[in-house]
Amino acid sequence: MHGNSLQYVKLSEHASGLIRGSAGAAGYDLAAAHPVVVPSFGRALVKTDLAVKMPPGLYGRVAPRSGLALKKFIDVGAGVVDPDYRGNLGVILFNFGCDPFRVKRGDRIAQLVLERYESPPILEVDSLDSTDRGDAGYGSTGVGNWHSALWEGFSSGDLKESFV
C-alpha cells in the first residue's frame, strides 16, 4: 500500500513536514526543528526532527537551497541518507559568510532529493582493464595546461589589459 511512497514521521512537535516548493520541484524542503547559529566560516548540525523511509531503489541526497547559497553563503555537507536509516535527519550547514547565520525554527535549510542507486556484487580482482586516461586525475580531463596558457597571456601582455 505505501511501498512506492516517501514516508516520514515527525519526531517532535517542532518538526515541519516534507514540502515541495512547486509541482515540478525535484526536492522536498527540509526545515529546522530548533534554532541554531552557524558561526561565520564555521559549521553546525541542524536537526529536522524527521525520520524518513525511501521507496525501494532510492536513497536521499541532502542538497543546498540555491537562495541560501547565493544570498547568505550557506552550503550543505555530507548529504547522503541511506535507505535503511530511520533516525533524525540532520543537515550540516557550512557558513562561508563573514556574519553568523541564524537559523530559526521552521526555516527551510536544505532539500531532500531522491536518487536511484545500484548495489552490484563486489569482486576483488588482481588488475583492472586499462583505459586511455589511466590513473590521470584531478583536472586531467579539463582544458589543456591552463596555468601555462594563463602565464603566457600575462607575460605577453595580452591578458594584462583585460584586468586594468
Swiss-Prot record:
Cofactor(s) this protein cannot do without: Mg(2+)
Modification sites for N6-acetyllysine: 71
Pfam families hit by this protein: dUTPase
EC number: 3.6.1.23
InterPro entries: dUTPase (IPR008181), dUTPase-like (IPR029054), dUTPase-like_sf (IPR036157), dUTPase_trimeric (IPR033704)
Membrane-spanning residues: none
Keywords of this entry: Acetylation, Hydrolase, Magnesium, Metal-binding, Nucleotide metabolism
Residues annotated as binding substrate: 65-67, 79-82, 90, 138-139
Role played: This enzyme is involved in nucleotide metabolism: it produces dUMP, the immediate precursor of thymidine nucleotides and it decreases the intracellular concentration of dUTP so that uracil cannot be incorporated into DNA.
UniProt-recorded name of the protein: Putative deoxyuridine 5'-triphosphate nucleotidohydrolase
